[in-house]
């Protein structure tokens, strides 16, 4: 009973006390003003806009009401006088803002304003106006009456708005008036005036009426990005202006439902697409076409049918054929014209409330539309007829022709001969031997190298060497000392500075004294000197310097290097010149000098420079300068006579020379012709930009970026965009239907393959065909800024290569056609975005199924067509789709009828004369093995789908309304079941990948038996675990006899299932050991058995058997380690440990002064091709010279040998039988730690030694065990029972020490050191490999020893049973499983009893399935002749050739089964029977009937080789029957999954049937052509998603659908491949369905959906067809049938 005292009953409090207990939150703020935020977007929250509730202001606050704080933009409101008592009990009365509108007298000023309308203020009879009223400002305020207002007249000339302290200087008593506007509307006007969007002016008419003019100010005009601009949420200003305009001009939106925020758009229950198509057809029939043209073009081979002529005529009408588009600028659909009383024209949008001054032009007339003729009616021919009939006449040639007075600069380096010289002519030319080879001076080369290769860390000396060697072909090896001396001089002069390191091992950058002119100025000073002085300096330099400054002569490189000039006699040069005159006339030029990036020319130290007056080319010579000048001038004069000067001049000497090509090559002298952009003057390779030399005087050249930025080039070409699968089909159709040479056709493959095609080249074509894949990829090449433009990236140096933009946007296409246009119906996909960016006159969407999920899909096509305003999503939804959803389809239907043409097969069937199409359904039955597999999958999938569907509350939702991830998740079980109906191996994740081999049914049966056996062992393990646990509970409770009986039950169960199952040996050991302990204790009540004496021996055998595996592993690991250790001893004997070979090599390198090369080689080997570990200092950064390398290697080798010795000793100490101390320490340390491993036992210590040794021997990328557990502690991950690492934690990469040794050995070999050094080094490398092998085997040996100790601990744990914690024993933390609290005993007993019941039931079920599969295997045994000798358990007769198998595995003859079914069926619908042996329930549909006799039906007796699934075998048999009945007939096989097609292809190969398969894009066209043309290939395997769109395969007459297709439009597309115009034979559709599976349910559901949608041709996907309830129904009904 509760200890609380009884309380008194509640008593009603009197009124006075209630008043005392009441608290008013506004009491303390009675006279305090409330600051209400004045947001420009939203009205004041909580305010009531009706005029009936205004707050009367107190006199002290009247002046503050109208005050507007410009900084805070707030409204000041106060509460009225104290609230009455009865009001305090109720809800606080609503607030409202005081009406306060200032109306000024009208005066003329220069500001723009437009008169919108006026409102009338009528004075009451007793009121009158004062004198000069029209010259005064008035304030309109609300009164106590909701229908009347007060006006206050201000002093004359008083500016009420500009006064801040006293804005309402009331000069007289308020005048009562009535307004033509409501109080709410007046409030809106006040808000608009306060925001300075409108202005109110008063104009009295008589003594009793005041007219108030509403004027729109310039700030009230809308600023729109485009005319159809519509924000998803209207601003407050627009909302109020809309109300005002409706009041003034009655501008209510015509015939359109207003937006209802509370009622969002909802998809209609059923969208009848046929109703839309019927409306379109009726509309076109009622129209009279203004154009009737004979569209049968002479170049068109096929004769157009009447419906095709009508379609082409309609398309011509849409393109305004023989009539120009309307030139009058029509008013935009969304806007209305308003003319003010002053004659000013404004334009108002009644949908958004926006007003503008500019005329809203509706834009160009729509040219194009949607051609939606049904599949197979010849849309391709109709488009070709349109292209041939209507060509563009007004092509502007300005962009395609070269402007007057301009010449394209086209330059070819001189070594490139336009025409080849004959061999005899070359022999006649006598060349003198080269006298001298020149190159830039060393200081120029070094400064150029430092400048060009400068980075964040500077330039190393090696980088300078590489640059000088590769660019100038300078002999660095020979002249290294000269380069070093020059570098020291440059550092001393301040032109170069060292930023890192010491000596030449550091890095360098340009110094503070360096200037851009240094390179050329220095060389010019040297070049200006007289030849005599130069020769003198050359002689002084000596032979060594001369050899270092000049490269060795090599005739093979002479012509390739522009820096070396060879000087010949005038006679020989003149002979060569005569041969080269023709090529010079074509625009070729003389040798030139390669400028640097700044346009300067590198000069030579021993040459004079002479500028030729007639050109900018430079002729360089060491002697005879005058003669050379004459030769150069003479040569250029010849060129000038025929070619414009810009073509012959070398561009490299000009200051504005820039070269940047799309090929990415650097600006080096090559033999490729170059061309210059007329706009940005950029030079590029002519071939790279597809500019032909023959167009020099005809076509202008602009670089790709300039072309894209210019106005598009107008052309008469038609761009056709098609799927990849039918791209080549377009070419075939054009070749077949159009006479040769009538059309020029180009298949464009994108800038990746074709490069940048010149727009004038595209403009010369009649048809350009691209694929959607190319179109999608071209989007990446549209908005690429010019690298040197303002939008491009600003780089320190010029970019190496130019990114290529897409040329498609540089052309104004005459016509753009989207074939299979449903691919762009989603306007967010890349292909749709690119299609919208293309510039075109006529736009066409071509699709037999323009509607996929619903009518909202048409929006993507409307966006491509660019039809305003419906190409904006807001207007599409508001004006068309929302009314359609609300049962008002007229607007949408009328709009679509204007842009869409549709001809259906049923309407023109008499014109096309296509033979009929029939359908044949093949109902199949699973084999027993497949049925068992399917039932397993169904059980798992049902559980999965129930769990997922529970998360969805509303099952009436369509799957299309859910997000994609959820839909994929809940459809996945359905997908698995559908795949299981085709082939077990098609189910993902069930078996090995198909690449290995296709599984036969025998292999499937074997796999199922193994799985079932594993499941039986798992169920038996759970049962034994429960029995052992219950025995422990009985021992705790003192019930020893029951415990012994349970242990004996475990041993009996183990013996009973000995032949079928494998019992866990540790569980048997647990039962044997504890039973033996009970018997030794001699507890009363335990009966003896004959087996009691053998328990000790059995326990010993179990222990020995368990330990034998571990002992064997230890012995094998030790045996594998021994030969490797022997090899190591042999290698070590060959190496001199006192004087290592690498030490001798280092000493020799120092002795020969090649130590720097050795150091650099070692560093390169360490740093190259290996990723450095982050946060770790590399070995290459620890030494600078050979002395440091020597010390580092010595230290590391000593540490390596030390770690190696420690690891070997640690492993050696672990050998032998483990002692009790070792086992106990390992148990406490890591086998059974309290929380985290302690790493204190000998095994863990050895593991740390292994980690250390591994970091020395291999690349240090491993992580030790301690570090791993430290991270776990930091992350607070808790227990880590199974997280102890067992092997290495990183990659076994080559260590830096070994790589250094390899580099030293390579250095010794290259410099041919002593052979004994090299041999010893090779032996040392072999020793490293042996050490690594030893490490791996040593670690495996350590693991085997560790596992042996772990096995000993496992045996000790296996004998422990449940026990109660002793009161004196501390509570374990974390809890230990076998130690329980006293109060948990009964709880654990109940849990174990439940586990026992579940495990017993599961074991019985799985054993039945295993027996069932075993009997199935017997039925497939052909050695017995198909006769089962076993007797029937009921009638004892031989089963023979026909019997029945239940799911429990027991077999009965057919007669006994029929009696049991008729007389002894059980269940709610009497649909199940119980086995006569085990009493397990089996559904009637789950009974398998085995027939081993030959089939009597000869028609089905077509042998199919191989063991395949039921469906695959049926498909192959059907294909074989087709060939038997109609040899040569071709068939298409469609499947949703590529894996299923691969399985079918394997079956066809086994049966020697020729076929073609389309699986990859690359072989698509090749395989398709082979199927069409090769009479031996009569089968084509097609995936549904790629092979069902747009293909024309009328060669085939049979279509095989392997599985039911949830998307009816995909099915229509697949069938439409053969049933189309041009087909001359009857076609047959074959469907393959499995009885009593998900396929039967799906077929029934799809038929019902088809009838309910009135055969709608809408394209429904799985998500749009199914609801959540439908999906649940698919599984639940089938489950009921199975049960």
From Swiss-Prot:
Classify the source by domain of life.
Eukaryota
Mutation: residue 1222 to D; reported impact is: Found in a renal cell carcinoma sample; somatic mutation
Where do Basic and acidic residues bias regions lie? 12-32, 534-547
One GO biological process from the UniProt record? protein polyubiquitination
As stated in the Swiss-Prot or TrEMBL entry, residues carrying the post-translational modification Phosphoserine are 266, 635
> Position of motif DEAQ box?
819-822
Identify the keywords attached in UniProt to this record, alphabetized: ATP-binding, DNA damage, DNA repair, Helicase, Hydrolase, Metal-binding, Nucleotide-binding, Phosphoprotein, Transferase, Ubl conjugation pathway, Zinc, Zinc-finger
Q: Which residues form the H15 domain?
A: 438-512
Summed up, the tissue specificity of this protein is:
Broadly expressed.
* Gene3D superfamilies in alphabetical order: P-loop containing nucleotide triphosphate hydrolases, Tandem AAA-ATPase domain, Winged helix-like DNA-binding domain superfamily/Winged helix DNA-binding domain, Zinc/RING finger domain, C3HC4 (zinc finger)
Reported EC number(s) for this entry are: 2.3.2.27, 3.6.4.-
What range(s) does the Helicase ATP-binding domain occupy? 307-389, 710-868
- Give the residue ranges for region: Disordered: 1-43, 525-607
Zn finger regions (RING-type) covering which residues? Answer: 1432-1479
List all Basic residues biased stretches: 568-588
Helicase C-terminal domain residues: 1514-1672
Any one annotated GO CC term: nucleosome
Catalytic activity annotation = S-ubiquitinyl-[E2 ubiquitin-conjugating enzyme]-L-cysteine + [acceptor protein]-L-lysine = [E2 ubiquitin-conjugating enzyme]-L-cysteine + N(6)-ubiquitinyl-[acceptor protein]-L-lysine
Outcome of substituting residue 267 to A? Found in a patient with autosomal recessive hearing loss; uncertain significance
Q: How does it assemble?
A: Homodimer. Interacts with HLTF, PCNA, UBE2N and RAD18.
Q: Per its database record, what is this protein's job?
A: E3 ubiquitin-protein ligase involved in DNA repair. Upon genotoxic stress, accepts ubiquitin from the UBE2N-UBE2V2 E2 complex and transfers it to 'Lys-164' of PCNA which had been monoubiquitinated by UBE2A/B-RAD18, promoting the formation of non-canonical poly-ubiquitin chains linked through 'Lys-63'.
The name this protein carries in UniProt is E3 ubiquitin-protein ligase SHPRH
Species: Homo sapiens (Human)
Q: What is the lineage of its organism?
A: Eukaryota, Metazoa, Chordata, Craniata, Vertebrata
């Amino acid at each position: 009973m509760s200890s609380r005292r009884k309380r008194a009953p509640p008593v009603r409090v009197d009124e006075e006390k209630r008043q005392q207990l009441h608290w008013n939150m506004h009491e303390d703020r009675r006279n305090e003003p409330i600051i209400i935020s004045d947001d420009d977007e939203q009205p004041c929250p909580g305010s009531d806009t009706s005029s009936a509730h205004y707050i009367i202001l107190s006199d002290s606050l009247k002046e503050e009401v109208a005050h507007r704080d410009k900084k805070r933009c707030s409204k000041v409101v106060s509460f009225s006088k104290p609230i009455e008592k009865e009001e305090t009990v109720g809800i606080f009365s609503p607030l409202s803002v005081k009406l306060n509108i200032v109306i000024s007298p009208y005066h003329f000023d220069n500001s723009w304003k437009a008169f919108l309308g006026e409102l009338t203020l009528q004075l009451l009879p007793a009121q009158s106006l004062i004198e000069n009223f029209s010259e005064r400002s008035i304030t309109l305020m609300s009164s106590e009456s909701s229908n009347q207002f007060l006006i206050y007249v201000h002093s004359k000339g008083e500016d009420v708005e500009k006064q801040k302290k006293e804005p309402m200087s009331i000069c007289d008593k308020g005048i009562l008036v009535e307004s033509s506007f409501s109080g709410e509307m007046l409030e809106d006007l006040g808000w608009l005036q306060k925001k300075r969007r409108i202005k109110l002016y008063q104009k009295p008419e008589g003594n009793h009426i005041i007219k108030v003019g509403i004027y729109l100010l310039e700030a009230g005009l809308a600023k729109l990005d485009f005319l159809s601009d519509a924000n998803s949420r209207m601003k407050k200003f627009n909302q109020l202006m809309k109300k005002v305009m409706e009041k003034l001009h009655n501008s209510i939106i015509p015939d359109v439902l207003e937006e209802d925020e509370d009622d969002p758009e909802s998809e209609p229950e059923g969208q009848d697409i046929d109703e839309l198509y019927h409306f379109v057809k009726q509309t076109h029939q009622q129209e009279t076409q203004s154009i009737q043209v004979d569209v049968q073009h002479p170049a068109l081979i096929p004769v157009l049918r009447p419906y095709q002529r009508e379609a082409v005529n309609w398309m011509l009408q849409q393109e305004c054929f023989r009539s120009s588009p309307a030139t009058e600028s029509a008013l935009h659909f969304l806007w209305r014209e308003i003319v003010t009383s002053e004659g000013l024209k404004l334009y108002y949008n009644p949908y958004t409330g926006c007003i503008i001054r500019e005329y809203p032009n509706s834009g160009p007339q729509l040219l194009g539309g949607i051609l939606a003729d049904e599949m197979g009616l010849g849309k391709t021919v109709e488009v070709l007829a349109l292209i041939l009939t209507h060509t563009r006449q007004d092509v502007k040639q300005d962009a395609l022709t070269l402007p007057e007075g301009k010449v394209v600069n086209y330059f070819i380096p001189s070594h490139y001969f336009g025409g080849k010289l004959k061999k005899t002519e070359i022999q006649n030319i006598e060349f003198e031997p080269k006298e001298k080879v020149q190159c830039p001076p060393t200081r120029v080369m070094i400064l150029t190298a430092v400048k060009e290769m400068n980075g964040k860390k500077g330039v190393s000396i090696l980088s300078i060497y590489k640059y000088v060697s590769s660019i100038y072909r300078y002999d660095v090896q020979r002249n290294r000392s000269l380069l070093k001396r020059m570098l020291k001089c440059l550092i001393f002069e301040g032109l170069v500075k060292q930023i890192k390191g010491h000596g030449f091992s550091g890095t360098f950058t340009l110094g503070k004294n360096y200037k851009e002119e240094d390179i050329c100025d220095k060389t010019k000073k040297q070049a200006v000197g007289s030849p005599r002085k130069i020769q003198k300096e050359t002689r002084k330099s000596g032979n060594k310097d001369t050899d270092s400054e000049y490269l060795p002569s090599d005739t093979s490189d002479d012509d390739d290097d522009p820096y070396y000039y060879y000087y010949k006699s005038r006679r020989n040069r003149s002979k060569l010149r005569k041969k080269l005159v023709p090529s010079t006339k074509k625009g070729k030029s003389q040798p030139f000098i390669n400028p640097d990036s700044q346009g300067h020319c590198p000069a030579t130290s021993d040459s004079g420079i002479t500028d030729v007056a007639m050109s900018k080319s430079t002729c360089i010579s060491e002697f005879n300068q005058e003669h050379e000048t004459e030769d150069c001038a003479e040569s250029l004069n010849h060129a000038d006579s025929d070619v414009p000067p810009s073509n012959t001049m070398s561009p490299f000497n000009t200051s504005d020379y820039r070269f940047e090509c799309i090929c990415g090559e650097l600006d080096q002298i090559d033999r490729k012709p170059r061309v210059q952009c007329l706009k940005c003057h950029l030079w590029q390779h002519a071939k790279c930009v597809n500019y032909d030399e023959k167009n020099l005087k005809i076509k202008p050249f602009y670089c790709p970026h300039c072309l894209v930025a210019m106005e598009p080039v107008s052309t008469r070409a038609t761009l056709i965009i098609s799927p990849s699968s039918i791209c080549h089909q377009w070419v075939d159709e054009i070749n077949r239907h159009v006479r040769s040479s009538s059309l020029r056709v180009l298949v464009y493959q994108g800038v990746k393959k074709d490069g940048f095609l010149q727009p004038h080249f595209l403009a010369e074509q009649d048809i350009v065909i691209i694929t959607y894949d190319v179109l999608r990829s071209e989007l990446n090449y549209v908005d690429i800024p010019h690298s040197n433009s303002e939008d491009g990236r600003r780089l320190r140096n010029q970019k190496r290569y130019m990114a290529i933009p897409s040329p498609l946007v540089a052309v104004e296409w005459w016509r753009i056609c989207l074939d299979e246009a449903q691919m762009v119906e989603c306007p967010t996909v890349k292909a749709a975005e690119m299609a919208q960016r293309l510039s075109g006159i006529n736009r066409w969407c071509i699709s037999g199924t323009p509607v996929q999920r619903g009518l909202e899909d048409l929006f993507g096509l409307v966006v491509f067509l660019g039809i305003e305003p419906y190409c904006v999503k807001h207007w599409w939804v508001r004006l068309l789709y929302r009314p359609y959803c609300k049962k008002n389809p007229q607007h949408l239907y009328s709009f679509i009828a204007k842009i869409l043409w549709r001809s259906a097969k049923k309407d023109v069937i008499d014109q096309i004369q296509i033979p009929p199409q029939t359908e044949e359904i093949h109902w199949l039955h699973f084999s027993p093995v497949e049925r068992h597999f399917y039932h397993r999958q169904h059980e798992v999938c049902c559980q999965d789908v129930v769990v997922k569907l529970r998360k969805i509350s509303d099952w009436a939702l369509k799957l299309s309304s859910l997000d994609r991830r959820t839909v994929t998740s809940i459809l996945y079980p359905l997908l698995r079941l559908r795949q299981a109906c085709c082939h077990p191996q098609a189910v993902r994740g069930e078996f090995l990948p198909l690449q290995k081999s296709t599984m036969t049914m025998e292999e499937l049966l074997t796999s199922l038996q193994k799985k079932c056996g594993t499941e039986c062992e798992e169920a038996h393990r759970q049962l034994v675990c429960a029995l052992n646990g219950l025995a422990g509970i009985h021992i705790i409770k003192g019930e020893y006899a029951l415990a012994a009986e349970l242990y004996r039950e475990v041993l009996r169960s183990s013996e009973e299932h000995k032949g079928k199952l494998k019992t866990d040996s540790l569980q048997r050991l647990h039962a044997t050991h504890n039973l033996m302990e009970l018997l030794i204790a001699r507890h009363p009540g335990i009966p003896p058995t004959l087996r009691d004496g053998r328990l000790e021996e059995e326990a010993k055998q179990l222990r020995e058997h368990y330990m034998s595996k571990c002992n064997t592993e230890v012995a094998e690991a030790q045996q594998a380690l021994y030969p490797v250790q022997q090899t190591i001893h042999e290698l070590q004997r060959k190496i001199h440990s006192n004087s290592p070979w690498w030490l001798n090599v280092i000493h020799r390198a120092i002795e020969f002064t090649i130590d720097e090369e050795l150091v650099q080689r070692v560093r390169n080997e360490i740093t190259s091709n290996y990723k450095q570990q982050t946060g770790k200092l590399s070995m290459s950064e620890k030494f600078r010279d050979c002395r440091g390398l020597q010390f580092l290697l010595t230290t590391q080798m000593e540490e390596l040998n030390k770690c190696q010795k420690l690891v070997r000793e640690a492993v050696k100490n672990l050998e032998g039988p483990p002692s009790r101390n070792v086992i106990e320490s390992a148990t406490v340390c890591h086998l059974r730690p309290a929380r985290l491993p302690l790493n204190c036992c000998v095994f863990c210590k050895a593991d740390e030694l292994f980690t250390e040794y591994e970091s020395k021997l291999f690349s240090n990328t491993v992580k030790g065990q301690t570090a791993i557990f430290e991270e776990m502690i930091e992350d607070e991950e808790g227990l880590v029972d199974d997280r102890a690492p067992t092997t290495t934690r990183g990659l076994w990469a080559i260590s830096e020490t070994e790589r250094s040794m390899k580099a030293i050995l390579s250095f010794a070999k290259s410099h041919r050191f002593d052979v004994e050094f090299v041999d010893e080094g090779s032996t040392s490398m072999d020793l490293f490999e042996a050490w690594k092998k030893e490490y791996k085997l040593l670690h495996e040996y350590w693991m085997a020893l560790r596992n042996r100790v772990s096995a000993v601990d496992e045996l000790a744990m296996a004998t422990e049973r449940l026990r109660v914690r002793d009161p004196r024993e501390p509570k374990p933390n974390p809890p230990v499983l076998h130690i329980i609290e006293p109060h948990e005993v009964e709880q654990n007993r109940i849990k174990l009893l439940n586990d026992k019941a579940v495990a017993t039931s599961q074991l019985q079920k799985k054993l039945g399935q295993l027996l069932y599969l075993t009997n199935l295997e017997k039925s497939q045994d052909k050695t017995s002749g198909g006769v089962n000798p076993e007797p029937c358990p009921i009638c004892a007769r031989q089963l023979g050739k026909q019997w029945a198998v239940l799911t429990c595995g027991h077999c009965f003859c057919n007669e006994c089964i029929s009696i049991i079914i008729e007389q002894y069926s059980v269940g709610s619908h009497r649909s199940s029977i119980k086995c006569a042996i085990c009493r397990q329930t089996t559904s009637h549909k789950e009974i398998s009937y085995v027939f081993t006799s030959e089939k009597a039906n000869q028609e089905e007796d077509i042998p199919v080789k191989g063991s395949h699934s039921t469906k695959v075998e049926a498909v192959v048999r059907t294909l074989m029957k087709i060939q038997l009945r109609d040899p040569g007939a071709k068939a298409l096989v469609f499947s949703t999954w590529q894996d299923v097609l691969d399985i079918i292809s394997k079956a066809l190969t086994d049966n020697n049937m020729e076929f073609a398969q389309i699986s990859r894009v690359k072989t698509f066209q090749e395989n398709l052509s082979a199927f069409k043309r090769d009479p031996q290939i009569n089968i084509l395997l097609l995936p549904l998603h790629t092979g069902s769109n747009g293909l024309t395969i009328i060669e085939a007459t049979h279509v095989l659908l392997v599985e039911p297709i949830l998307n009816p439009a995909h099915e229509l597309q697949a069938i439409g491949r053969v049933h189309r115009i041009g087909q001359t034979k009857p076609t047959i559709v074959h469907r393959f369905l499995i009885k009593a599976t998900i396929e039967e349910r799906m077929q029934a559901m799809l038929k019902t959906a088809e009838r309910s949608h009135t055969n709608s041709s809408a394209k429904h996907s799985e998500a749009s067809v199914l609801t959540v309830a439908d999906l649940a129904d698919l599984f639940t009904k089938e489950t009921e049938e199975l049960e």
